[in-house]
Amino acid sequence: MGLGVRAAPFTYVAHALAVAAATMVLVWCIHFRGGLAFEATNKNLIFNVHPVLMLIGYIILGSEAIMVYKVLPTWKHDTTKLIHLILHAIALVFGAVGIYCAFKFHNESGIANLYSLHSWLGIGTICLYGIQWIFGFVAFFFPRASPSVRKGVLPWHILFGLFVYILALATAELGFLEKLTFLQSSGLDKYGAEAFLVNFTALIVVLFGASVVVAAVSPARVEEPHEYAPIPES
């Protein structure tokens, strides 16, 4: 399935938005929220690691893994496949550490865990992400299924991957909303600089995710690599 447009312009837009989103979340957590720390008497610094790792390490790196076939269309397929696999693995590790930091913050601050939709979706999404990675490793890398099996499961692998990716984006949006709501209920100015920064960061993430999805389902060139197409056509 193609959209009649090439992927390249959307990968450029996605990369620009990724830089913007990463910069904005760092400004938020370091300038407005006081910095980052794995160990601190100020427990909020521990929490600050969570949005940074989840956005930059989990969503942005995961997005790069999704777009690698479009960003490097002339590279050997086995090379881009390995990059795809490694980037997803790194994103998964960063996501796990980011979730650990949220639990650590809650536990050390006496806050209950897993009570919100954001937390439920977060755990569910990273579990699905892990399952998707394991399936992709076994089917396409090692021990690697037969060509006919790979051809049959590839569309499902792509569709499920995009589903998990969109779910991760939705979870991030809920996270921004939840944290900003908590801050505003504690006295943060609803129309202040920090509130606007968080809201605009969330909007940038939506646009970024949309660019990644469009790039993923658009052809990189006239002829896609033999074994990989965004959504293989019948």
From Swiss-Prot:
Ligand binding (L-ascorbate): 65-73
Binding site for heme b 1: 50, 118
Cofactor note text: Binds 2 heme b groups non-covalently.
GO molecular function annotations of the record: metal ion binding; oxidoreductase activity
Residues given in the record as heme b 2 binding sites: 84, 157
SMART domains xrefs: B561 (SM00665)
Cofactor(s), by name: heme b
Cellular compartments per GO CC: membrane
Principal place of residence: membrane
Matches recorded under Pfam families: Cytochrom_B561 (PF03188)
Binding site for monodehydro-L-ascorbate radical: 114-123
Domain Cytochrome b561: 13-217
All ranges on the Extracellular side of the membrane: 31-48, 104-121, 173-194
Membrane-spanning residues: 10-30, 49-69, 83-103, 122-142, 152-172, 195-215
Parts of the chain on the Cytoplasmic side: 1-9, 70-82, 143-151, 216-234
Keywords: Electron transport, Heme, Iron, Membrane, Metal-binding, Oxidoreductase, Transmembrane, Transmembrane helix, Transport
Function comment: Two-heme-containing cytochrome. Catalyzes ascorbate-dependent trans-membrane electron transfer by utilizing a concerted H(+)/e(-) transfer mechanism.
Protein name, UniProt field: Probable ascorbate-specific transmembrane electron transporter 1
Classification of source organism: Eukaryota, Viridiplantae, Streptophyta, Embryophyta, Tracheophyta
